[in-house]
Amino acid sequence: MSVLETFDPAVAEVIRHETERQEYNLELIASENFVSPAVLEAQGSVLTNKYAEGYPGKRYYGGCHCVDVVENLAIDRAKELFGADHVNVQPHSGSQANMAVYFSVLKPGDTVLGMNLAHGGHLTHGSPVNFSGKLFNIVPYGVSKETQTIDYEETERLALEHKPKMIVVGASAYPRIIDFEAFRRIADKVGAVVMVDMAHIAGLVAAGLHPSPVPYAEFVTTTTHKTLRGPRGGMIMCREEWAKTLNSNIFPGIQGGPLMHVIAAKAVAFKEALTPEFKKYQEQIVKNAKALAEGLTKRGFKLTSGGTDNHLMLVDLSQTELTGKVAEEALDRAGITVNKNGIPFDTRSPFITSGIRIGTPAATSHGLKEAEMEQVAGFIADVLGNVTDEAKLAAVKTQVNALMKRFPMYADRLA
C-alpha cells in the first residue's frame, strides 16, 4: 500500500476512482487534457515546499537557487516556443493572468471591448458577474447571426464608437480561426492596446496550426493546460516595454508566492511542446475534431458555424427537444464527458443551454484517431437519441469502456 492509502484511505479512494474515470471514460471537455507522467512527477515534487516571492535573482526569501533555475527554464522555453519578448510564468490561473494584464493597462471605469460570453467569449472578458465586468466599462462584440463567426465589421464599428483603451481577443467556445491581424488593425484605428487570451488554442499556436497572436498583441495570456497539455496554471507574454509593469502587477500586485512545483511542471510541458512529437499530436487533435464534426453532421446534428477549424465544436440542439443540460447528463451516464454550453443568440439560461461543447485534446492524448472519432460520433448519436433509455445508455458505456481500454493512459496507476 502507498503512504497515502495507509494514512488517508478516503482521499486515496477518491484519487483512484478519478483515475479510473479518466482512464476508462471518454473525456470530450474541450478545456481538459491529460498531462504526461513527467509533468505529474514535477508537480508532485518537493518544490511544493518552497516559498519564492519575487523573481529569479530578486527573491524575498533565501534558499531560492534551485527554484530560480527551474523558473528560468520555464521562461526560456516559453520564449522559444512562442517567440515572445518577455514571459511571466507565475500566474496561478488564466483568470489571474488576465487580471494582471488589465491592471497593467487599465484603471477602473476604462472602456474595454471583449467577446460576448454568450457568443463564445470567457467570463474574464467582461462578463457582468466577473471582476472584469464589475471594474471596467465593457462593450461586447460577437458573432454574425448569419455565419456565426466573428463579425469584424461590427467590432470595428463598436471600436470607433466607444474608443476602448483595450480590445480583448480570444474565446472559450469558438470553433474557427481568429484573425488577429484584423483586430490589430481595428485597435490601431482607436489607439487601443490588444490583449489576446489564447488559452484554448495555445497548443495549436505552438505547433503552427493556428496563426500566432504574438506579433499582433501587446499582451498574450494563456493557460498552460488545455491544448498545451501542461499543469493547470497561467502564463503571460508581453512586449519588452510592458515587462516591468506586468511583473509588478503579478507580484506584489495580485499574488504572493508563486507555486514552484507548478512552474516546474510548466517547464517540463514546454519542453514537451518543443518536440516534433508534440506537433504531430496537435495535428491529430485537429484531424480528430474535423472527423468528429463530420461524423456528427452526417448523423443529422447541427454545428455552430457549420464545423470547426480547431480542437472544439458546438453542437446546436435548439431545433431538437433536448437541452444542453439533458444532453450532458445523458452522455455522462454513458461514460462520455462533455459540457452544456450556450450557443450564439441562445434563449435558454446558462444552467440549461441549447448546446454542448465537445473537444478532442484529451481523447487524442489517449491515442484515439479518425477511425475512433467515427465510433465516438455514433456513441453520441445513440445516447442523444435515447436519453431516457437507461439500458441503451449502459450499453453505450460498455462500448466506451471497451474502446478506452485499447488506449491506456494511466493504467500503471491502477495496477
Swiss-Prot record:
Entry function: Catalyzes the reversible interconversion of serine and glycine with tetrahydrofolate (THF) serving as the one-carbon carrier. This reaction serves as the major source of one-carbon groups required for the biosynthesis of purines, thymidylate, methionine, and other important biomolecules. Also exhibits THF-independent aldolase activity toward beta-hydroxyamino acids, producing glycine and aldehydes, via a retro-aldol mechanism.
Swiss-Prot/TrEMBL catalytic activity: (6R)-5,10-methylene-5,6,7,8-tetrahydrofolate + glycine + H2O = (6S)-5,6,7,8-tetrahydrofolate + L-serine
Transmembrane feature ranges: none
Gene that specifies this protein: glyA
NCBIfam families according to UniProt: PRK00011.1
Major subcellular site: cytoplasm
One Gene Ontology biological process: glycine biosynthetic process from serine
Family as reported in the entry's similarity comment: Belongs to the SHMT family.
Name used for this protein in its record: Serine hydroxymethyltransferase
Disulfide links within the chain: none
EC number per UniProt: 2.1.2.1
